[in-house]
Design a protein with these regions (language model features):
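Noncatalytic, basic helical substrate-engagement surface that gates or grips nucleic-acid strands
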Residues: 2-139, 147-163, 167-168, 249-262, ...
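Non-catalytic nucleic-acid-binding/docking modules located in mid-to-C-terminal regions
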Residues: 50, 55-62, 166, 172-306
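Alpha-helical elements of the RecA-like P-loop NTPase motor core of helicases
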Residues: 122, 146-147, 215, 225
Length: 306
């Protein structure tokens, strides 16, 4: 298998950042009825910039999108999962850019994967696990990926997170930073979040248990299973955890990523992806700068042919 580094991009995470994390909007060049191209432009700009700045050479790049029914299984377990996220209006704006983004990836030879009944993080966990000998970088702002991190060792490569929203020099996150900042190892990160909560996924955690308390309870390599016999579940906080025990285990199951998603054959090819051109050129090749008949737009033809 290839020793070429593998970059796995959380497509929806980058898509929403491209849409809502940019102070200035980018519009088409139409004289009238200008169209907002911020999401499409910034998606490619952020993808290219992060890789160019943080990696010595272009890796194999695979962009992974959430499936349409990706969160269904977790929502069956807990109806509150991600229930705090807006579902309409402005929240749909990034999704409307998906056809053009996918077409741009196709046009410039960047692989993308979407499994209809899986979330992107589970697909990324599966792809990372499928090539343990390779160095893997996960492009995302989502801290849930911290559970996948590992240092390089005999027979296996590293897994790190690349968060390009952070300042230069601190964008690549490995196990040492997770231990320093959160007080737990990557292997215990799902246990830690089950106790302390994860607001982004609407997982409340145990009432009265914050990040520091959760880390202290798990100190020394403990897991949830080892807590009842540890002598640490004392006082009001211990009672709160004991009372919510089954719910805590359920939350951890939701936070844990699935490493066995059936991904499409050939999702990884083992060779470097050709470098992306600048975002302006991508938008130009997609025929989006100036209004055109749909049949004249490269991205429309590519999307319709799928």
């Amino acid at each position: 298998m290839s020793a070429i580094p593998l970059l796995l991009c959380d497509g929806h995470n980058l898509l929403f950042r491209a849409c809502f994390g940019t102070p200035a909007q980018i519009f088409s060049r139409d004289k009238e009825d200008k169209r907002d191209l911020t999401t499409e432009f910034m998606f490619f700009a952020l993808l290219r910039k992060g890789i160019n700045e943080e990696l010595p050479s272009w890796p194999e790049v695979v962009v992974v999108f959430d499936g349409e029914d990706g969160s269904a299984q977790r929502k069956q377990t807990d109806a509150g999962y991600k229930a705090n996220r807006p579902a309409g209006g402005e929240a749909l704006k990034p999704i409307r850019a998906l056809p053009a983004v996918k077409a741009g990836l196709d046009l410039f030879g960047v692989s993308w994967v979407e499994v209809s009944d899986a979330e992107a993080d589970d697909v990324i966990a599966t792809l990372a696990a499928s090539c343990p000998e390779r160095d893997v970088l996960i492009l995302s702002m989502d801290q849930d990926y911290y559970q996948l991190l590992r240092d390089p060792g005999l027979g296996h490569g590293s897994v790190q997170v690349l968060n390009t929203a952070r300042r230069a020099g601190s964008r690549v996150i490995g196990p040492a930073e997770v231990r320093a900042r959160h007080g737990v190892s990557p292997a215990a990160f799902a246990d830690y979040r089950a106790l302390s909560g994860d607001a982004s996924d609407n997982i409340p955690g145990v009432h009265g248990i914050g990040a520091k308390t959760a880390a202290a309870l798990l100190d020394g390599g403990l897991t949830l299973e080892s807590l009842p016999a540890s002598g640490r579940l004392t006082g009001r906080k211990g009672d709160a955890i004991t009372s919510a025990w089954q719910q805590v285990l359920s939350w951890r199951d939701m936070i844990r990523m699935n490493h066995q998603v059936p991904v499409p054959a050939g999702a990884l090819v083992g060779r470097a992806t050709a470098p992306l051109p600048g975002a302006a050129e991508v938008i130009e090749k997609l025929g989006l700068w100036n209004r055109a008949r749909p049949a004249d737009a490269v991205w429309y033809l590519n999307a319709a042919g799928r």
